[in-house]
């Protein structure tokens, strides 16, 4: 078994909506990013790549490459997952923690789980997404941006 950890953060800037976990969430602010700014899928992709020793999302999809400008993070996740599977890994489970003062994530979490399970070709029982605040502390607490952490467990298919 292999464990990977991912982290991502994006600052608010411009107009909303925002995309988190593949879900378009109405909000007055947008997130500044080269791609669609989906902190949840970026952290998850990093966790999966880390568990497979394939580097990170920036190595695979560099923000210096114009091809990834405005990229759909669900497509990036699916491509990373294809590469991970090609190395002989299967999914154990993933756990995602979104850190944001606002907007409220709870109403959107069920759809995030659906999208992640679809993209990874797994059962929803293998996908957990939760959200928390920092009780108005730090940059997320001041409403300056959103952060996310993710953990992934992989298994070698032949073991």
UniProtKB/Swiss-Prot annotation:
GO terms for molecular function: 2-C-methyl-D-erythritol 2,4-cyclodiphosphate synthase activity; metal ion binding. It holds the Pfam family YgbB. It catalyses: 4-CDP-2-C-methyl-D-erythritol 2-phosphate = 2-C-methyl-D-erythritol 2,4-cyclic diphosphate + CMP. Its EC number is 4.6.1.12. SUPFAM superfamilies: IpsF-like (SSF69765). The record marks 34, 133 as: Transition state stabilizer. 4-CDP-2-C-methyl-D-erythritol 2-phosphate binds at residues 8-10, 34-35, 56-58, 61-65, 100-106, 132-135, 139, 142. InterPro entries: MECDP_synthase, MECDP_synthase_CS, MECDP_synthase_sf. A divalent metal cation binds at residues 8, 10, 42. Keywords: Isoprene biosynthesis, Lyase, Metal-binding. Binds 1 divalent metal cation per subunit. The keyword Lyase applies. Pathway: Isoprenoid biosynthesis; isopentenyl diphosphate biosynthesis via DXP pathway; isopentenyl diphosphate from 1-deoxy-D-xylulose 5-phosphate: step 4/6. Its cofactor is a divalent metal cation. It comes from the Bacteria. The keyword Lyase applies. GO terms for biological process: isopentenyl diphosphate biosynthetic process, methylerythritol 4-phosphate pathway; terpenoid biosynthetic process. NCBIfam families: ispF. Homotrimer. Belongs to the IspF family. Involved in the biosynthesis of isopentenyl diphosphate (IPP) and dimethylallyl diphosphate (DMAPP), two major building blocks of isoprenoid compounds. Catalyzes the conversion of 4-diphosphocytidyl-2-C-methyl-D-erythritol 2-phosphate (CDP-ME2P) to 2-C-methyl-D-erythritol 2,4-cyclodiphosphate (ME-CPP) with a corresponding release of cytidine 5-monophosphate (CMP). This is 2-C-methyl-D-erythritol 2,4-cyclodiphosphate synthase. The lineage of its organism: Bacteria, Pseudomonadati, Pseudomonadota, Gammaproteobacteria, Enterobacterales. The gene is ispF.
